[in-house]
Amino acid sequence: MSELTELFRNAIDLNRYSNSVSLRLVRAWNDAVLDVVEQLQLLDALDQSAKATRLRSVLAQLKESLDTWAGSSTLAMQQELQGLAVLQGEFATRQLQRALPAGRADIVRTVEISPTLAQAIVTAEPTAAGVVNLSDSLVRMSTQPVTFQLTLGQQLTLPNGQTIKQAFSSMSERQVDIFSLTVRNGIIQGESIDAITRRVRGRLQRDQAGSIDSIIARGGQATAIPNNQIRAIVRTSVNQVASTSDQLIAVQNPELTKHYIYTATLDTKTSDICRALDGKMFRHQEGPVPPQHYQCRSRIRNVPRGLEKEFSEIRETYGEWLNDQDDDIKRDVLGPQRLQMWNGLVRKYGPTNAIRKFVAQDGSTLNLDQLKSRGYGSSSE
């Protein structure tokens, strides 16, 4: 399998991995909300004084539940991203090895993944003592073994500058305020408790089956928007780990790669900035890197020294390449049950847009163990 083929296969698989993590966090959030909604429905049987007292208790329960969710979700993200960083570090190493001319793969220096990496990604403050930018330590890192650890905490924040921990906490606090305002205003305006609960929960049921898209579609005011935000945070963080792994391998091997190509082929609703950057070549540490925005799926490709011209002349999109392959390769990349879906998208949209539509509609999931079985960990080779 070629270096470019592996890159896009990896991007599709990471999308499925982010679906898996998002679904777990979304279901936990929705369970917390539904617990409170069930308590809210009991207010109808109470008199006005008891109703006010009970409402305060219900809102306190929501705050406690969502604060607990934020804490447990932060820990879950630490565990998930730690494992993912190990896999992606190995994958980025193999990508550079396969792009080099024959006989040079063994000279690629690898990156050690620190056990404290995930804590840095999820909780590190940009101004925390001891946190150093990647660019600040470029010379040191070029001559010494790289440890992917707390020194990268500053770089691994979300596009708005927040850490994952901050994003989850602020989202929980905001939704408690919105829920409280919605319920209180509804009661003041004479709306029935039943109508209020339908508005905040939508048609969502406990243990709701289906993809994350279908769960969001069934949700109400207290779940649909937060569920979308959870998915955006997870997807952005997963892509950031992958992108940073690519960058670290380049920093550790400056004599092997001097440039990278920005690749935005899998961005379904490609932003103006990613569309403008797609296919452009930049020197390492001097150009833009993903994620440029929330839910960004763009990646970078490290270009081996001396092959800049050949890499810059590659114009075939991944959709075009994939459509020319036999069905076995298509099944390996897309999944054994999705070949018919792919063929239908190609007929309707053409191969380039078909791959983007496919990723957008693909609600399937992969956990870390399944990613390993797909060949990303060294232990699975």
Model-identified regions with their sequence ranges:
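Acidic, glycine-rich two-metal-ion catalytic cores of nucleic acid-processing enzymes
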Residues: 214-313
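N-terminal leader/targeting and assembly helices and adjacent pre-domain segments
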Residues: 1-216, 307-381
